[in-house]
C-alpha cells in the first residue's frame, strides 16, 4: 500500500470495535485553531489512542538520545584542543542544530500526543513549525558544507585552499542566514504554518491549492532538498573516484617495489576505496531516507497525487527526527580523535578503546582536512 493512499481504517478504530461514527481527527482541536485546519483532514476518523501513545513514546526516546548524543559531540569537540579545528566547526554546528531541533520539538510533540491533539495554541503551532524548518534547513546545509569541505581536501588535494576558522564561521553564518530566510517567508504570506495529520504537529501548508502557496513548496524543495542532495552526491562521487585513483597508484607503486601492498597487514584486505564508498553510500542513503518522505508528502499535497492520511504524516515526522539521532554517530562519534577524547572523559561510554584507520575513513577524512587547515 502506498504511503499516501487511503489508509486502513483499523489504524483509526478502537481495536476493531466498531469505529467512531461521525467523529473526525479534528474534533479535539482547540476552537482557536480551527481556522488553520484544511478541510482535507475532516474526512479521517480519530486515530487509535495507541498510535498517539506509540508516537509520543518514540519521539520522547529519539529526543532524549539526540539531545544526549549531540550534546556530547558539542562538549567533546568544544573542550578538546586537538578537535577545535575549522572543519570540525561544521561538525559542531550540525550537532548544535540537531540538538536544538529535538530540544525544541520533542517535548511539545510528547505533550500533544498525550492529549491526542495540538493543545498549545496557534502561536506555538507557528513557532513549532518555524523551528522545525529552521533547524532542518540548518542541518541539511551544514551536511552539504561538510561534504564540500571533504571534496576540497580529498579531490583537490594540495591545490585546494584550506579552510580557516574565518571561512568556516562565514559558511556557518551563511547557513543560518539562508535558513532564517526560508523559515520566515510563511509568516509573511508565502505559504503558512498549520496543524497537520493527526493534529499533534504543525508544518507548512501543502494542501493549499493557491499557486502562491504551492510555489513556496516548489522553490523550497529545490533549495532545501534537490540542490543539497545533488551537491552531496556530486561531492562523494568524486571523493570515491579520487581515492580509487590513489589506490591504483599505490598498487602500481607496490608492484614496482616488488611487495604485495604498501598498506599494513591489518588493512591489506580492505581497500580504502571500498571503505569510503560504503561511507559515502551510507551518508547519502541516510540523508535520502530522512527527508524524502516529507518531500513525497508535500508534492502529493500540492499536485494531488493521492490521499494523504494522518498516519502517513507520522512516518514523515519520525524519519526526519531520526536524522538528528544518527548524525552525531556518522559525523562525530566516527571521528577517531573524538573517540579518543570520549574514552578519556567518559571511559564507561567510549565506543572503542583505540581509534583506527577505518574509523578515520568513516569520518570522511576530516582529520586530513584538520591537519591541512592547521598547517596553513
From Swiss-Prot:
The chain crosses the membrane at residues 52-76, 89-113, 129-148, 168-191, 216-243, 279-302, 310-334. Belongs to the G-protein coupled receptor 1 family. Opsin subfamily. Keywords: Chromophore, Disulfide bond, G-protein coupled receptor, Glycoprotein, Membrane, Phosphoprotein, Photoreceptor protein, Receptor, Retinal protein, Sensory transduction, Transducer, Transmembrane, Transmembrane helix, Vision. GO terms for biological process: phototransduction; visual perception. PROSITE patterns: G_PROTEIN_RECEP_F1_1 (PS00237), G_PROTEIN_RECEP_F1_2 (PS50262), OPSIN (PS00238). Glycans are attached at residues 22, 198. The modification N6-(retinylidene)lysine is found at residue 321. Residues 353-376 are annotated as: Disordered. Residues 358-368 have a biased composition (Polar residues). The keyword Transmembrane applies. It is a multi-pass membrane protein. GO terms for cellular component: plasma membrane. One of its GO terms (molecular function) is G protein-coupled receptor activity. It holds the Pfam family 7tm_1. Disulfide bonds join 125-202. Phosphorylated on some or all of the serine and threonine residues present in the C-terminal region. InterPro entries: GPCR_opsins, GPCR_Rhodpsn, GPCR_Rhodpsn_7TM, Opsin, Opsin_lateye, Retinal_BS. Its main location: membrane. Residues 1-51, 114-128, 192-215, 303-309 are extracellular. It is found in: Membrane. This is Rhodopsin.
Amino acid at each position: 500500500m502506498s504511503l499516501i493512499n487511503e489508509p486502513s481504517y483499523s489504524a483509526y478504530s478502537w481495536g476493531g470495535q466498531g469505529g467512531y461514527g461521525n467523529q473526525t481527527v479534528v474534533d479535539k482541536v482547540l476552537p482557536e485553531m480551527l481556522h488553520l485546519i484544511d478541510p482535507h483532514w475532516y474526512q479521517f476518523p480519530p486515530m487509535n489512542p495507541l498510535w498517539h501513545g506509540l508516537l509520543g513514546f518514540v519521539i520522547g526516546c529519539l529526543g532524549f538520545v539526540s539531545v544526549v548524543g549531540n550534546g556530547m559531540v558539542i562538549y567533546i569537540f568544544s573542550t578538546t584542543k586537538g578537535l577545535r579545528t575549522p572543519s570540525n566547526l561544521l561538525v559542531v554546528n550540525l550537532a548544535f542544530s540537531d540538538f536544538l531541533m529535538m530540544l525544541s520539538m520533542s517535548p511539545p510533540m510528547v505533550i500533544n500526543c498525550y492529549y491526542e491533539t495540538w493543545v498549545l495554541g496557534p502561536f506555538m503551532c507557528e513557532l513549532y513549525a518555524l523551528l522545525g524548518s529552521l533547524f532542518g534547513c540548518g542541518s541539511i546545509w551544514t551536511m552539504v558544507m561538510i561534504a564540500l569541505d571533504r571534496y576540497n581536501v580529498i579531490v583537490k588535494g594540495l591545490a585546494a585552499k584550506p579552510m580557516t576558522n574565518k571561512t568556516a564561521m562565514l559558511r556557518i553564518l551563511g547557513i543560518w542566514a539562508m535558513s532564517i530566510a526560508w523559515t520566515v517567508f510563511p509568516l509573511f504570506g508565502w505559504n503558512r504554518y498549520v496543524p497537520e495529520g493527526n493534529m499533534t504537529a504543525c508544518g507548512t501548508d501543502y494542501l493549499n491549492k493557491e499557486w502562491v502557496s504551492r510555489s513556496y513548496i516548489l522553490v523550497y524543495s529545490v533549495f532545501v532538498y534537490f540542490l543539497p542532495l545533488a551537491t552531496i552526491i556530486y561531492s562523494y562521487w568524486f571523493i570515491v573516484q579520487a581515492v580509487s585513483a590513489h589506490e591504483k597508484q599505490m598498487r602500481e607503486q607496490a608492484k614496482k617495489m616488488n611487495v604485495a601492498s604498501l598498506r599494513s597487514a591489518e588493512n591489506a584486505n580492505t581497500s580504502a576505496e571500498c571503505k569510503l564508498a560504503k561511507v559515502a553510500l551510507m551518508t547519502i542513503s541516510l540523508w535520502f531516507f530522512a527527508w524524502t518522505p516529507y518531500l513525497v508528502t508535500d508534492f502529493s499535497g500540492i499536485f494531488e497525487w493521492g490521499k494523504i492520511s494522518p498516519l502517513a504524516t507520522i512516518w514523515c515526522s519520525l524519519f526526519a527526527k531520526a536524522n538528528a539521532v544518527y548524525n552525531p554517530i556518522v559525523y562525530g562519534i566516527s571521528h577517531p580523535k573524538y573517540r579518543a577524547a570520549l574514552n578519556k572523559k567518559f571511559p564507561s561510554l567510549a565506543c572503542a578503546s583505540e581509534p583506527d584507520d577505518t574509523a578515520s575513513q568513516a569520518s570522511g577524512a576530516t582529520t586530513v582536512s584538520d591537519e591541512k587547515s592547521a598547517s596553513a
